[in-house]
Amino acid sequence: MDLKSHDTADFRLVYRDAGPVSLLLDKAGVKPWFDGEHTVLKQGGKVEARLLRTPSGTVFVKHYLAKGVLRRLLAWVGVFRAQRMFRVSAALQDIGVRVPRPLAFLVEHRRDCSSSFFVCEALDAEDLKSVAVNRGLDAIGGAFRLFDEVSNTLVRLHGAGYVHGDTKWANWMVTRGEPQLVLIDLD
């Protein structure tokens, strides 16, 4: 994987392609980039997920706050959730597991709280639970095809030493057009 990095006094950025993070490379700072035009998908005390519109299109960004003692200690020694997500996503793609393409991760260093950001492709998809409830499984090839694909994916995942930890219908996305299953929420 061809990666580039960009370091400032405030953050370290590792990326594949400059488009989604061009504002950071242009010295806009983390806050203006993350607070750009966006849609909040999930907001909590430790994690926030957004669809962020960038000059190269919409991307999915998950912001991890290292607030607790353990997370702060791990951040202090250089272990960040976004970096782990980036590496796991790339490794899973390498073994044929469909996951959103990882684009970048950013590690921000602040006195009050270290945080990290995972950036990946935004999917044109809906979650499997919604598909099953609203349109039925026949709309995506039927139950047999679905369970065959899910089981084969989980075999590849487990065969490579990975466990999802939260495998549920809502963590499988079904792409629009030619329906394909994509596994999400890998953390």
Which residue ranges define each predicted feature?
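Conserved ATP-binding subdomain of kinase catalytic cores across diverse folds
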Residues: 26-128, 149, 155, 159-160
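AlphaC helix of the protein kinase catalytic domain
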Residues: 128-138
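A short beta-strand motif that forms part of the nucleic acid-binding face
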Residues: 65, 135, 187
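Catalytic-loop of the protein kinase fold
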Residues: 159-169
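Active-site flanking residues adjacent to catalytic metal/cofactor-binding acidic residues
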Residues: 61, 165, 184-186
